[in-house]
Every structure is written in C-alpha cells, then in structure tokens.
C-alpha cells in the first residue's frame, strides 16, 4: 500500500510540472496565439497586394495601348485626307494635260496622193511611174519624153492675196508602197530673169478627192491654206520620200499632214552647147514606208478609278473611326471597373 501511494504522488507531481508554465504565463500564450493568427493573415494580405499590382499594371498597359490606337487612327485619317487631295489634284492635272498617243497602221497600198506643182514658165517634159526604185538612164535630157501620168491643170486665186492667179499642175502620186512605186518628173526652163530657179510644190492626201470635188478651185485654196509648200531646184535631182501622219483632234475631226525626207544629187549636163539660161529640173516622189502614223490625245484620268479609290479611302476611314470609338468605350469601361474595384478595396480596408 505504501508503495502505491508513493507512485501516485509522483505522477501527480509530474502533471503539475507540465501545467505550471501555462498557468504561470498566460499572457505569453496569448501572444503566441496572436502571432500564429497574424502569420496566417499576413500571407493573404500580401497575395492581395500582389494581385492588385498586377491588375493595375495590366490596366495601365491597356490604356496606353488604347491611346496608341487613337494616335494610329489620327495618323490614318491624315494619310487618307492627303490621298484624297492628291487623287483629286492628279485627276485635274490629267484632264488639263492629255497624253499624246502614237500608233502605226501598216498598209499595202496608199490612196494616191495629189502632187500640186507650180512650174511657172517651166515646161513639163516627161512624167512616168517606175517600180522598185529603178529609174532608167536619161536618153535625151532636155527634150520632151513619155508622159504616162494622170495630170490636171487648174488655175485659182491665191487665198492669201486674193489678187494673184496661180496655175497648178496636179499629178497623181504613187500608190504601191510594197513594190516601191515612184513618180519621176522632168521640167525644162529655157530662160529666167531670176537669180535662183526653183519650182514650188505641195502635197495633199487624196487625188481622187480632188477629182470628185464639185468646186476644185475652192478645194485647192483649202489645200494651200492647210498644207505647207516646198521647192526643188534646177540642175539637181531631188528625191522626195513621203510619210503620212494623221492627227485626231479634240473635237473628233482628223487632220492629215505629210512629212518628207529629201535627198539632192547634182545633174551632170552632157548636152552640147546648152543655153546659158537653160535649166533642167528633176524630181522623184516615193513613199518612205508602209506605215501611217496616227496621233491622238488620250486623257489618262479615269473617273471610275478615282471614285473607287475615294470609296476605299472613306471605307478605311469609317472602319478606323468605328475601331477608335470601340477603343474609347473599352477604355472608359476598364476605367470604371478599376475605380469600382478600388472603391470596394478601400471600403473593405476601412
């Protein structure tokens, strides 16, 4: 019995030793509990602060991005306005300054041109058509020869002076350009009081039009007013190579112009004792090439392309404006949401 009592008293003493520190220092235990609670609360507050900072940085980035989008819209609007102005300016310039278009039409046979010669006191000795650029040697220069050309004589009043009567010899020109047809004419002038001797001539587009004209005098006056005249001198053989140029005017009418290249070679006179004032004239008319040059003014400004470009520019402007409007609304919405969340956090803290 005595041994059992000693064992019970020892166990009781050990139990008292374990509970005495808590009983002796109740404030320390309370501080330990507060520290544990604080340690449990502090991580939650730190996580909230980090989340708030991340959300704030995202919001700032979104706002900056939206502002940049607005600036991009303004830049696009400026570029679009400049494009509209430049397009309208270019369209007006193209209307005022059309572009010249040159094309070439190939033909095998030309309409026979008319050759109007003004020999004055000179006399036609011969006129023949030859092919393939071949002119036979002169048999008896200065004497009348073979005349196989179709000719017409006409007299009319000079359209510039209205007082001088002009006498013209109209000759049908070459037609077959593929076989290089040419017309060779020889004139003789026995005496002259002038220091220089030459024969005038002009070219017009159609000999048939002259024949079919009801008023040939008026026709020749119009030709002299419209076409330039040239000369060929005595003592030489003048080779005239013609080319035809057709120009389409703005009113739709068509004008015809002859361009020519001439080459002159000296005539070696082998006649015995020719008269001092005796002059021989030789002239050749031939087509240069089988191409008719056609010229017309083309307005490159296309109103439909300008309208399409303007519509595209305005469509881009409207799309950009709509995008900018949505961006502003989104910025306002994000700002309001941020303010509401901040107010809620402040209320929670308070």
Curated annotation (Swiss-Prot):
All disulfide bonds of the chain are none
Q: Which organism is it from?
A: Xenopus laevis
Compartments where found: Cell membrane
GO molecular function per UniProt: pH-gated chloride channel activity
Q: Which residue ranges does the entry give as Extracellular-facing topology?
A: 85-297
**TM region positions:** 64-84, 298-318
* Superkingdom of this protein's organism: Eukaryota
Pfam families with a match to the protein in the record:
TMEM206
Q: Tell me what this protein is called.
A: Proton-activated chloride channel
- Primary residence: membrane
Concerning its family, UniProt says: Belongs to the proton-activated chloride channel family.
Substrates-to-products reaction catalysed:
chloride(in) = chloride(out)
Give the membrane topology.
Multi-pass membrane protein
